[in-house]
Amino acid sequence: AWTLSNILEVSCVIETINKAKARRKIEEPLILHSDRGSQYVSNEYKRVTANMQCSYSKKAYPWDNACIESFHSLIKREWLNRFKIRDYGHAYRLVFEYLEAFYNTKRIHSHCDYMSPNDYEELYRRVQQHELLMAG
């Protein structure tokens, strides 16, 4: 799940967590990893994530967040740098197009066995269901 905002507030983080839970039809994500930004150490964030396993990167150590840092570089390089972004609405549409119409659905990823994230996740679900059927 994702949320685009021009402010760094805990409400945006909580909105994204709720979107992820709804999309996956689960009550709690297994692990939430973040940096130590103020929105991730707030009392509200701690309350909402009390039943989740939270992981934090070391302060001023971006290598702990290499995956998301790489993603931010990728979305800029592959998509956003092609445009002169006019306003928030334009930025939102561009991010939506990249994530929902390309990155998650069509773009292959080496760490997903050269499948899109959506295809990889669907395969994972089918394997899990098959294993449950075979075990039971």
Q: What positions do the PLM features span?
A:
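Distinct, well-ordered alpha-helical segments
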Residues: 17, 44-46
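Short helix-loop-beta connector
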Residues: 25-28
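RNase H-like two-metal-ion nuclease catalytic core shared by retroviral integrases
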Residues: 34-36, 42-43, 56-76, 89-97, ...
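Short small-residue beta-strand/loop micro-motif enriched in glycine and branched aliphatics
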Residues: 1-2, 54-57, 81-82
